[in-house]
Amino acid sequence: MKTSVLPGVLLLSAASAGLQAADVNDVQNHYRDSGAGPFSFDRGEMLWNSQFYEGRQCATCHGTDLTRNGRHERTQKPIEPMAASVNTTRYKDLKEVEKWFMRNCKWTWGRECTPQEKGDLLEYLKRL
């Protein structure tokens, strides 16, 4: 009797796809669960363009055209575009999004971002 491995492969593939199914709205829902929202494009844009800790702003490294690559000011490492329209996978992994918010908020703002600020920034970035 021959057994097919195809059903098992299909099941594993479907399960793996479920892990990657999140999008920017799912990430924002995580912040809503923390009591944040509603999120605002205008507040996100204002936060993006404001100067914070030691005169830094998001555009210092990410640039002003968020459909293009940026460059980290200190390390000179390239940064992929932030606009969701050209970088469709950037905001699909909550753990990855949180890691970068933690690093970048502390470096740019001198503190962690609030869930409201994160949601507003994502609202801005997802519409570009």
Tell me what each language-model feature is.
Residues 70-77:
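Short cysteine/histidine-rich zinc-coordinating motifs and their immediately flanking basic loops
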Residues 34-38, 52, 91-95, 111-116:
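Soluble non-cytosolic domains of exported or imported proteins
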Residues 79-95:
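Short microdomains enriched in Cys/His and/or Lys/Arg
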